[in-house]
Amino acid sequence: MNDRPHVGHAYATLAADVLARYHRLLGFEVYFLTGTDENAEKNVEAAHKNNEVDIQDYVDRMSAVWQETWKELDISNDDFIRTTESRHRVGVEKFWRAVENKGDIYKGTYEGL
């Protein structure tokens, strides 16, 4: 999300939109989620490249561009979530606690397939 969406992003999102619409037509319950990953080093680099001091201001502006792009393309997403939102953090923390509580986080040595 370190820059404006390009045709590749539009292609992938349009393909997902087609699938969501098709499955809705078939009567399936569909929850189509889109969003932006704002917790990346590339966002920091892009903000600095654009002489931005506040990284959050930069990702706020870029996220708005992405949301507007999907609106202009009439993407039928049910929700747009940003990784800097508290509701995302809460979900991620819940996931990692569940994984840890099941004992699925451990130190080891990778042995290959």
Where are the regions that the model predicts?
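N-terminal, positively charged nucleic-acid-binding surface of large information/translation enzymes
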Residues: 1-113
